Each structure stands twice: as structure tokens, then as C-alpha cells.
UniProtKB/Swiss-Prot annotation:
Record family assignment: Belongs to the class-I aminoacyl-tRNA synthetase family. Glutamate--tRNA ligase type 1 subfamily.
Chain's gene name: gltX2
Binding-site list for ATP: K256
Cofactor: record remark: Binds 1 zinc ion per subunit.
Motif 'HIGH' region boundaries: 12-22
Localization in the cell: Cytoplasm
Protein name, per record: Glutamate--tRNA ligase 2
Chain span(s) of sequence motif 'KMSKS' region: 253-257
A GO BP entry: glutamyl-tRNA aminoacylation
Recorded catalytic activity of this chain's protein: tRNA(Glu) + L-glutamate + ATP = L-glutamyl-tRNA(Glu) + AMP + diphosphate
Residues binding Zn(2+): C109, C111, C136, H138
Any one of the GO CC terms: cytosol
The species this protein was found in: Alkalilimnicola ehrlichii (strain ATCC BAA-1101 / DSM 17681 / MLHE-1)
Organism placement in taxonomy: Bacteria, Pseudomonadati, Pseudomonadota, Gammaproteobacteria, Chromatiales
Cofactor list: Zn(2+)
Length: 477
């Protein structure tokens, strides 16, 4: 296969917000396509009418665009293999259903859910894995008509060939073997006439020219069923790779309870898409060499992407690692990227000083809320001081702050000049000079370089804080 023939896809169901697991699946497929000069397709699997909605579909596509994952083919992008909403492909599926029935490779099943559950219970009681018992596999035409006359609405089941073994090479897990006798005939059309996942997912991949499918390992047992379907329909079979699942700190599958976030929540909190992409690209995929620690754009991530570097062990979500990439992304971000953060600042921060504030504290913030907190520290009343900050102020003593107040007017906005004057007046130097000034002016013992921060601080606010520090230093704990 030449690189230009590679086509991957992301095929979500638009039934709710997109979370990290689905986002990583989309990313890996996009990276695989771009790493080989191929195409990335988006298909919306919206056959579940009770849960799918147009609003969810629009949100999902907006999330992908925000992350920079633009599809080459699919909804709104067009393409020759559409439509790309499964809800619009009923006639396509019906054609292949008829072909399977004509070849006696599919049959109507009239079993009720209660009958199926009783059968499964009996199989478990006998120590056998539950699978369809074949109750309707060989009904005569008369028996089928009688059941229809009783008002039973049949599903359509695929007839799985007996005594075979489905063998395929998984791009992540190597050779996989599944005896067909352990599969059982499975539903390909629901009783309401809608297409079941096994069927429409496989047929659409084939008809849309998808060559490679990366999806979660929870789909591994679906693959032999889909390969059997494609073989029966004489349709091309893609190469499959089943990636590891993401788990939380507790080792359980990632969920809202143990740390999962939706893309919408990430965006609202101020996570930058570059940070999320760089973290997820390394969550279950190992980059080597210089690129391992570099913040890369999408093409850079794709250039170093390899399916043989995809891991099999569960990928544990690590928020600290995600924060590391956020720090790199914030440091590298241009003014336009962080402009929305400025708009979220409190009115107390003068509009003409917002960019300077961002520049002063950029290396010490990760999110818009962090910037807002620094806006408060520079232009508003300080929050309550931590015990270690109070201790620094008391250790400096009231005379230290009296000296600072005496020099305030002549050194307004010029921290080096203020520090020099206080040093001359008190003899303090090093940590004994800078730490008490930082503690009094910002309410913290550590933070960004104090010069740019002090240059932004109004003189009356600086005076008030030095006076408060003088009063605190004169008290005993």
C-alpha cells in the first residue's frame, strides 16, 4: 500500500460530550494518517435515535476543530463516500442485508429478550459462556410467518460459520485468533430496523475506503465478527489495531469519578489544545529521541508516530504530566492565543496594564484563573497570608518596613531602586532583603520576578501593604 492510500477514521456516536478517551482515539488515527501522507475521515455513528442529537454532533465537531484535528473527509468537509451520518445510510445497509439473506448468511430472529436471558442463564449454569443458541437459525418459511402473525418483530442475525478460526494481525497486539464456535450468531439489524454496530461500522469502513482502524481494546472481540461480515459481503478488510484503555489513579477505567474531563471542560478551564495534544500523544505511545520531551505541533507529532510504539498495558492518566505540557504550551503561546485570558480579568485590573501583567507572571501561571489571582495580588486586596509568609514578615521587623515606606515615593515602580535604598538603610541583603519585600508586596514567599510586578503596582496599594506588614511585624504570634 502506498502512503497516499492510507485512510483512517474517527467514528464517534454523538450522544454526549467528548472525553479524553475518545479524543485520544481521534488523535491517534489522525497521527497515523498524517504520518503516512494519508487522509483522516470523520463519520458520525448516529443510528441510536434516542440518544444521538444534532447539537451533540455540532459540539463534537467543534471540539475536534478546537484541538486542531481537522478531517479531510466527512460532515461539512464532503467527500465521495458520503453521506457521513449513519442515520442517512439506511438504503446502503438494506442492500447488503438483502445480499446476506439471499445467500442464507443471515436470518430473522424472533426471540424475545426474556427468552434470550433465560437461555444465557441456562448456559452459565452449565458452565458455558453465553452466546446465541441458534433457536431461530433453521426456522421454515411457515414458522417465520407464524411468528410474524403473532406480532413479533424480528432482528436479523448473521450466521457465523462453524469450526473455523478467524486470524488477523493486530497492529498493536500481534496475531489474534478467535474460534468461530465461541462467537455465536449475532444481531446485525435491530427489531426496529436500525443497523447494529457490528454491521454498519464494518460496512461503512469498507465502502469509505478506510485502510487502518485504531480503536480501544474493548473492541477487540468485535473484530472477528466484523471480519466475518466483510468476508461474506466480499468487501475489503482494514487493518485493525486495538489501543490500551486509559485508567485513573485507582487503576479503574477513566471516568468522571476518577479524573476524566470533557473537551469542553478542558477548554473552559483554560487548558491549551497544544498541551492536551502533546500529553495524549504520549499517553500509550512512546516517543524516542529529542522529540520525547519537545512540545510539537500536530505534524511534528505525526512525523514521529509509529504503530509499533503503541503500548499494550493500561495507560494511566497523570494530571501532573498534563500540567507539565500546559506549562510548556503557555510559555510558548503567542499573544493571540492567550488574549481570551485577558478578557476574563477582573475590572480592577486596568485594561492598559493587562498585557504587561501577563508578561510579568507568564512563567508562574498555567490557567486563566492563575492570571486572575495575580491580578488580584497586584491591583486588589491581598487574600489572607499563609503562616510562612507571616513568619517572614515578623522576622524582618517593623524597622525594615519603616525604611521601605520612607523610600516608597522616590522609588515608585522601580523595584531595584527600592531594594537598593532599603539595603542601604537596614543593611539587609540577599534573602533577608528580597524575601520580606516579596512577602509584604505580594503576600507570597515565592513567585515571578518582582521587578515587573512592582512596576505595575499602584503606589497607594504598595504603601498600604508595606504599612500592613509593618503592623504585623510589630506584633507577636
Amino acid at each position: 500500500m502506498t502512503p497516499t492510500n492510507v485512510k483512517t477514521r474517527f467514528a464517534p456516536s454523538p450522544t454526549g460530550r467528548m472525553h479524553l478517551g475518545n479524543l485520544r482515539t481521534a488523535l491517534f488515527n489522525a497521527l497515523l494518517a498524517r504520518s503516512r501522507g494519508g487522509r483522516f475521515l470523520l463519520r458520525l455513528e448516529d443510528t441510536d435515535e434516542s440518544r444521538s442529537s444534532g447539537a451533540h454532533a455540532q459540539t463534537l465537531m467543534a471540539d475536534l476543530r478546537w484541538m486542531g484535528l481537522h478531517w479531510d473527509e466527512g460532515p461539512e468537509a464532503g467527500g465521495e463516500a458520503g453521506p457521513y451520518h449513519q442515520s442517512e445510510r439506511g438504503a446502503v445497509y438494506e442492500r447488503y442485508y438483502r445480499a446476506l439473506e439471499a445467500a442464507d448468511q443471515a436470518y430473522p430472529c424472533f426471540c424475545t429478550e426474556r427468552e434470550l436471558e433465560l437461555s444465557r442463564k441456562a448456559q452459565r449454569a452449565a458452565g458455558k459462556p453465553p452466546r446465541y443458541a441458534g433457536t431461530c437459525a433453521h426456522l421454515t418459511a411457515e414458522e417465520r410467518e407464524r411468528r410474524r402473525a403473532e406480532g413479533r418483530r424480528p432482528t436479523l442475525r448473521f450466521r457465523v460459520p462453524a469450526e473455523e478460526t478467524v486470524v488477523f494481525h493486530d497492529l498493536v497486539r500481534g496475531e489474534q485468533r478467535f474460534p468461530t464456535d465461541e462467537i455465536g450468531d449475532f444481531i446485525i439489524r435491530r427489531a426496529d430496523g436500525t443497523a447494529a454496530f457490528f454491521f454498519c461500522n464494518a460496512v461503512d469502513d469498507a465502502l469509505m475506503g478506510v485502510s487502518h482502524v485504531l480503536r480501544g481494546e474493548d473492541h477487540l472481540t468485535n473484530t472477528p465478527r466484523q471480519l466475518l461480515l466483510l468476508r461474506a459481503l466480499d468487501l475489503p478488510q482494514p487493518e485493525y489495531g486495538h489501543i490500551n484503555l486509559i485508567t485513573g489513579d485507582d487503576g479503574a477505567p477513566l471516568s468522571k469519578r476518577n479524573g476524566s474531563l470533557s473537551v469542553a471542560e478542558l477548554r473552559e478551564a483554560g487548558w491549551l489544545p497544544e498541551a492536551v495534544l502533546n500529553y495524549l500523544a504520549r499517553l500509550g505511545h512512546h516517543y524516542t529521541g529529542e522529540v520525547e520531551s519537545q512540545l510539537l505541533d500536530l505534524q511534528g507529532l505525526a512525523d514521529a508516530f509509529r504503530t509499533d510504539a503503541l503500548g499494550r498495558a493500561p495507560a494511566r492518566f497523570d494530571r501532573h504530566q498534563l500540567s507539565h505540557w500546559q506549562q510548556l504550551a503557555v510559555h510558548r503561546a503567542d499573544e493571540a492565543t492567550l488574549a481570551p485570558w485577558l478578557e476574563r480579568l477582573d475590572d480592577a485590573v486596568p485594561a492598559d496594564r493587562r498585557r504587561a501583567l501577563l508578561a510579568a507572571v507568564r512563567d508562574n501561571i498555567l490557567f486563566p484563573d492563575d492570571l486572575a489571582a495575580w491580578g488580584q495580588r497586584v491591583f486588589g486586596p491581598l487574600p489572607a497570608l499563609a503562616p510562612d509568609t507571616e513568619a517572614v514578615i515578623r522576622d524582618a521587623g517593623p524597622a525594615f518596613y519603616e525604611a521601605a515606606l520612607a523610600e516608597l515615593e522616590t522609588t515608585a515602580g522601580d523595584f531595584p531602586a527600592l531594594a537598593k535604598a532599603v539595603r542601604k538603610a537596614t543593611g539587609a541583603k540577599g534573602r533577608q532583603l528580597f524575601m520580606p519585600l516579596r512577602a509584604a508586596l505580594t503576600g507570597l514567599c515565592r513567585g515571578p520576578e518582582l521587578g515587573p510586578v512592582y512596576a505595575l503596582m499602584p503606589v497607594d496599594i504598595a504603601r498600604c501593604r508595606l504599612e500592613q506588614a509593618r503592623e504585623l511585624a510589630a506584633t507577636t504570634p
